[in-house]
Each structure stands twice: as C-alpha cells, then as structure tokens.
Amino acid sequence: MRIVFMGTPEFAVPSLEALLKSDDQVVGIVTQPDRPKGRGQQLAPSPIKVLAQREHIPILQPVKMKAPEFLEPLAAWKPDLIAVTAFGRILHSGILKLPPMGCVNVHGSLLPKYRGAAPVQWAVINGDSETGITTMMMDEGMDTGAMLLQERIPILPEDTAGTLAPRLAVLGGRLLVETIRQLKAGILTPIAQNESQATMAPLLKKEDGVIDWSLAATALSNRVRGLSPWPGAYSFLLGERWTIWKAGAIPTQEHTAPGTIVQVTKQSLHVTTGNGLLEVTEIQPANSKRLTVAQYLSGHRIIPGQRFEAGPPVEAAQP
C-alpha cells in the first residue's frame, strides 16, 4: 500500500518509524515549514523532516494547504491512504477525498474526550488516572471523525506531560500500523463518536502557566505536572518570576492568604492555596537553571510569610 505520512513534532516520529518498519510503502512526507528556533532564531527543520531526509523520502512543506504547488505533487504520489500524527493543520475536503482508503489520524486521547491540540497536557492538568491513543477516520472537523481503534494506558502519579507524551507516541505508532493492517483486511468498522461526551483540549498559551493560588493544592500539583515542560507553572516571588517544576499537595486547614509561604524545610517550601498546602520541591528562579529547593536554600534565604504573586509588582507612575 502507498502511504503518505503527515506529521511535524517529536510526538509524530514513532508513528513514522513504525510505518517505515511495516509492509507498506511510505511514498512521501508532508510536514510544516521550517520554523525559527532557539536564541538565534535560526530556521530549523521539524523532527519529521529530519527523519524523512535521513530515510531519503520525498518531502512537501506547504505554506498554504490549498495551493496547487502542494496539491499537485501530493496527488502525484498516488497515496492509497494518508496517515496523520500531530501534523498541526486542518485537512480540507480536497485532501481528505484524495486517497481511496481515506485519511487516518493518531490522536493522543481517549476520544471523544480531549479533542484539540493539547490532549496530553489537559489529561494531566485535570488529574486523570488514565489516557490513551485513538485512531480515527478524518473528516473536516476538529478530531470529530469516526473512531477505529483505541488503547488505554495509566497516567502515573509522577507523570508530567513531558514524560507521558513519549509513551503515548510509541503506542500511537503501534496502533497506527495495526489500524492500517485491519483496514486492509476489511475487519475494522468505524464507530461514530458520542458528541454528548466530547470535551476540548485547546492549545496552551504562555499565560496559561500563571499559577492561581486560590485553586486547591491538588489542582495546582496537577497543573505543575501538566504544564511541564511548556509553558511551565510560574508565579512571582520578591518581584522575580519563579517556575515551579515539582510540587505535591498536603491536606491542611491553613487559612493564611493563598500564595503565602508558611513553612520552609530543608527540602521544600509549603505554600498556602485555596485548599491545602502546596509542597514545592523543584524550582527555577528567573535567570537560573532548574534547582531543587534544597540546592536553592544552600545559597539563599526564604522566610515564612513571603508570598507568591500572580505577576510582578507594578511600579507607581512618577508624578
């Protein structure tokens, strides 16, 4: 079978690797254009482009999905099926109708839960105990197509979005190959999603990392995990931005204003929240590397009563 693969980030790499090891032929790759990256903002290829170049597979990087200079070479590849993992663009009907066997998508959630661009992060943020991969036939909606296969995995208590995503990516590759095998064998029946159970997982923005200390400690602990590695959960202490990388919840009846440091131990800071204490154990102050609280306290002093704020202090206007 002739397959075109569409994908962009590291999450998509195991899917392409699995296809390359399968009995099918990957005849072309579609990935997003090179983007500025790093401090120098030099143009860098996507992880999928890097893999495609290494395997000497033809590549298309469309700026406009309806442009003839993209659609004509795509059609010339004559794909029987298009496989998509984290491509990052919506496919219009002209593409969806191109391959005789349709377009199959690998999605990082248990659909219809968490449709959208950040399903892994939101599953952790919301404190879910499990998640998984769903393969589906694509339509013009946002992850609304009929489901093909689905497999669950646990979310471990210590998981961050960054540790969970690679496990899901590997599962996605395996499930993609199995989905295609069953489609070719004619033994797979698409199942419509239950719209009443659908939830969304919108793309995270930098400002989503701001810590709202009025939330419960458990919710904040989950947010710290779900926002790692990007954008990171952050707050401001003594006018400086602090990113909190590791934290746990401690049940308590503490009534001090949320965000207040009420105890400093050798290993952690205990901070009040809307319900319970957040035990902070790993941080990254502004212009610093990631540190355990113990490492930070070896050279700095934190005093109970100091308080985290949602933003830096605002200077009063000069008369």
Regions inferred by a protein language model and the residue ranges of each:
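N-terminal glycine-/serine-/threonine-rich beta1-alpha1-beta2 phosphate-ribose binding loop
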Residues: 32, 36-80
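Conserved beta-strand segments of alpha/beta enzyme cores
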Residues: 25, 56-58, 102
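Amphipathic, non-transmembrane alpha-helical secondary structure
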Residues: 13, 17-21, 71-75, 177
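A residue-level signal for conserved active-site and pocket-lining positions in enzyme catalytic cores
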Residues: 7, 29, 52, 82, ...
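Donor/substrate-binding cores of folate-linked one-carbon enzymes
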Residues: 22, 32, 81-200, 205-207
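Short beta->alpha connector loops
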Residues: 9-11, 63-66, 87-89
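An anion-binding loop in the catalytic cleft
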Residues: 214-319
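N-terminal Rossmann-like dinucleotide-binding module
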Residues: 1-39
